[in-house]
Amino acid sequence: MCIVSEYIRTDSFFPLFVQGDSLEVLRRFSDNSVDCCITSPPYWQKRQYENGGIGLEDSPQEYIDNLLCIVKEVKRVLKPTGAFWLNIGDSYQNKTRLGIPWRVALKMIDDGWILRNDVIWNKHKGGLSPNPDRFGSVFEDFFFFVKSDKYFFDADSIRSKPRQAYVKNGAVVSATGVSGIRYKRQIELSTSLTAEEKKNAMSQLNLVLARIQSGEISDFRMVIRNEQRTTHSDSVKLSGRAKELKDKGFYFLFYNPKGTMPNDVWDIIPEDSQHRKMHFAP
């Protein structure tokens, strides 16, 4: 497939469409040549295509094995900086949900893939469920895989624009309304902090408020011993924050001044397929 090799060597932004069996086509790509791969293969026993293909296997395991053969080739052609997005839905057999997406994902992890996210695609709507004894399903898994820990990820381009700090009644207020007054009061009245810890906490809080005023940071939270819940865990073996709280009596959580990252639940309503004669899965 010299046309593929020639296309990869160019700087063209026009897409090249290659038609064929995915496994056979991928085998003709050179190693480490693709920046990103996105696919949504036919789900098991969900759709009958004219030319057959994946998804019509006799068993879930056979389907998973066939998928993993393709995934192996994706890993080979993907650059170390590249990403692989896999959207896959689940199926039922003998009344049980089979867990096919996670069976595939766990096997990929065993094969050396790095799973960065399981993004939940919340479709908001789905087909009418004829089943009287279980809930309808309106979500699918969208796995974000990489094959190297040094992958390309342009975080700043997808952040939500942060709100700005402001001054109210002579006091600087963070983007979400934190002025430090409540924290100062908690420090002063605390029976869990020593006099030295109170002094250090107040000093550090004033420095943080100064950073807010200068625009260096836009928002923060302060956790004070026995005043706020410890982040993640109270165990000093499991949480560095818990150890900091035990040793110092307080710690700070800072918001990224460039904004927050999107979460791992994406609300995307599928294209309306009513009155269509064909199903397109590019």
Q: What do the PLM-derived regions correspond to, one by one?
A:
Residues 2-282:
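Core catalytic lobe of class I
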